[in-house]
């Protein structure tokens, strides 16, 4: 066994495929981020969950344990939209901004859920900012 193969064998847990390792790494990142984020009634937490096809966004008051507003790509308004996932993410960002403002929320804390601030996540955040939410 060469040095490179030996190093790779040490790094990869037995029985763990790439998708499992990525899921575990994302969960660790999310835990690390969540240590410093707390949503309140004045500045609730905007949480993003992303799957391969859809996105779900919630505005949560962590102290009361309540969801104040929510939006998803599963809604008919977003499903009817033509375009790629980034366009649908931006539409979800607009929807959550409208619903949050209707609930009297203007400032939020952004919880990206351990995902990179890139692509769909960035499009959603930018659209929410343009919709009037302060991060």
Curated annotation (Swiss-Prot):
GO CC field: cytosolic large ribosomal subunit
Query: What's one GO BP annotation on this UniProt entry?
Result: translation
Claim: RNA-binding is one of the keywords in the record: yes
Q: Which InterPro entries match?
A: Ribosomal_uL18_bac-type, Ribosomal_uL18_bac/euk
Supply the alphabetized keyword list. Answer: Ribonucleoprotein, Ribosomal protein, RNA-binding, rRNA-binding
UniProt-recorded Gene Ontology molecular function terms: 5S rRNA binding; structural constituent of ribosome
Matches recorded under SUPFAM superfamilies: Translational machinery components
Superkingdom: Bacteria
Pfam families membership: Ribosomal_L18p
Annotated function: This is one of the proteins that bind and probably mediate the attachment of the 5S RNA into the large ribosomal subunit, where it forms part of the central protuberance.
Q: How does it assemble?
A: Part of the 50S ribosomal subunit; part of the 5S rRNA/L5/L18/L25 subcomplex. Contacts the 5S and 23S rRNAs.
Q: Which HAMAP family match?
A: Ribosomal_uL18_B
**Similarity comment: family membership:** Belongs to the universal ribosomal protein uL18 family.
Question: Could you identify this protein by its name?
Answer: Large ribosomal subunit protein uL18
């Amino acid at each position: 066994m060469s040095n490179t193969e030996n190093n790779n064998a040490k790094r990869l847990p037995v029985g763990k495929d790439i998708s499992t390792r990525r899921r575990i790494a994302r969960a660790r990142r999310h835990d690390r981020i969540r240590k410093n984020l707390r949503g309140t009634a004045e500045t609730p937490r905007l949480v993003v969950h992303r799957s391969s096809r859809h996105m779900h966004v919630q505005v949560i008051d962590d102290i009361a344990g309540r969801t104040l507003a929510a939006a998803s790509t599963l809604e008919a308004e977003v499903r009817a939209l033509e375009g790629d996932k980034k366009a649908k993410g931006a539409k979800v960002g607009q929807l959550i901004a409208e619903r949050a403002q209707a609930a009297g929320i203007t400032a939020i804390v952004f919880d990206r859920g351990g995902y990179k601030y890139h692509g769909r996540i960035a499009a959603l955040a930018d659209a929410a900012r343009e919709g009037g939410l302060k991060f």
